[in-house]
Amino acid sequence: MAKQQDVRPIIKLRSTAGTGYTYVTRKNRRNNPDRLVLKKYDPVVRTHVDFREER
């Protein structure tokens, strides 16, 4: 059975380059309550760009 409010929810990281490319990952809400921003590789534009958390 799943908990009501999961501590480690599955989130989508969407590219800020506007390509629509996404990564799927999990995050710990207790350690990172804010929206996550990670610099990752976007294969559509073939460079590293910021990926922001989408809910």
Swiss-Prot record:
InterPro entries: Ribosomal_bL33 (IPR001705), Ribosomal_bL33_CS (IPR018264), Ribosomal_bL33_sf (IPR038584), Ribosomal_zn-bd (IPR011332). One of its GO terms (cellular component) is cytosolic large ribosomal subunit. Keywords: Ribonucleoprotein, Ribosomal protein. It comes from the Bacteria. Pfam families: Ribosomal_L33. SUPFAM superfamilies: Zn-binding ribosomal proteins. One of its GO terms (biological process) is translation. Belongs to the bacterial ribosomal protein bL33 family. This is Large ribosomal subunit protein bL33. It comes from Clavibacter sepedonicus.
